[in-house]
C-alpha cells in the first residue's frame, strides 16, 4: 500500500519555538514565512512592505502547488490566526493528503511577548506586541475549534529546551496519550478538548 503524503501544520504562538524545534518533529522542510520575510527585508531594504508580503505569499502558493502536484509531504509554519490554514487543509485533504498538527504551546500572551523580546536580543526576528497578542488569542481559538480536522495531533511544550511532547493523537492507530503531568497551558487550553477526541 502506497504511503499517503502528509500536510503538517506547525502552529503555536509567536516565540513558542516552532522554527527552532519543528525539524525534530517534522521530516518535511517547513515553509517559514517569517524567516522568508526577514531574509527579503535584509536583501531588499528598499522594498515596500506590500512587495515583501506579496513575495512571501507567492512563494507559499508556489511551494503548495508543487507539493500538491508531486504528492509530496508539505509543512507550513503558522500562528493559525487566520482562515488561510483552513483553506490549505481543504486543498490538501481533497488531494488525498493526511493532515497533521504539531502545536507548540505557551501559557499566555505575556509569555509569548517575553519570548519574542528574548529572540530579538539574540538576533531573531521581531513581531509587534499587538500582533503577538492577536496571534496568541486568534491562533488558540482557531486551534481549539478545529482540532477534529486533523488525523494526527502532537502537542509540544514550547517552554522546554528540546520540545517535550505533551500529548499525542494518531487516528489510524487509535493512539491517544497525555503525559502524567502536562504543563499548565495544556491543561487550561486543550486537555478537555483533547480528551474528547
Task: Outline where the language-model segments fall.
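The conserved Walker
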Residues: 13-14
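NTP-dependent small-molecule kinase module
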Residues: 147-197
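A glycine- and Lys/Arg-enriched "phosphate-lid" helix/loop adjacent to the NTP-binding pocket
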Residues: 97-145
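Phosphate-binding P-loop
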Residues: 1-4, 67-68
Amino acid at each position: 500500500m502506497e504511503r499517503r503524503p502528509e500536510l503538517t501544520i506547525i502552529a503555536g504562538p509567536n516565540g513558542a519555538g516552532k522554527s527552532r524545534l519543528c525539524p525534530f518533529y517534522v521530516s518535511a522542510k517547513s515553509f517559514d514565512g517569517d524567516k522568508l520575510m526577514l531574509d527579503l527585508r535584509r536583501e531588499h531594504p528598499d522594498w515596500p512592505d506590500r512587495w515583501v508580503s506579496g513575495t512571501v505569499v507567492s512563494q507559499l502558493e508556489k511551494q503548495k502547488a508543487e507539493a500538491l502536484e508531486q504528492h509530496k509531504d508539505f509543512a507550513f509554519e503558522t500562528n493559525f490566526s487566520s482562515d488561510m490554514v483552513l483553506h490549505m487543509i481543504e486543498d490538501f485533504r481533497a488531494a488525498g493528503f493526511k493532515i497533521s498538527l504539531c502545536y507548540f504551546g505557551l501559557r499566555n500572551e505575556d509569555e509569548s511577548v517575553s519570548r519574542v523580546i528574548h529572540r530579538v536580543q539574540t538576533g531573531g526576528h521581531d513581531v509587534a506586541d499587538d500582533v503577538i497578542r492577536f496571534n496568541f488569542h486568534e491562533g488558540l481559538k482557531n486551534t481549539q475549534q478545529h482540532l477534529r480536522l486533523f488525523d494526527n495531533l502532537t502537542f509540544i511544550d514550547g517552554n522546554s529546551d528540546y520540545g517535550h511532547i505533551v500529548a499525542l493523537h494518531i487516528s489510524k492507530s487509535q493512539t491517544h496519550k497525555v503525559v502524567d503531568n502536562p504543563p499548565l497551558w495544556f491543561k487550561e487550553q486543550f486537555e478537555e478538548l483533547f480528551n474528547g477526541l
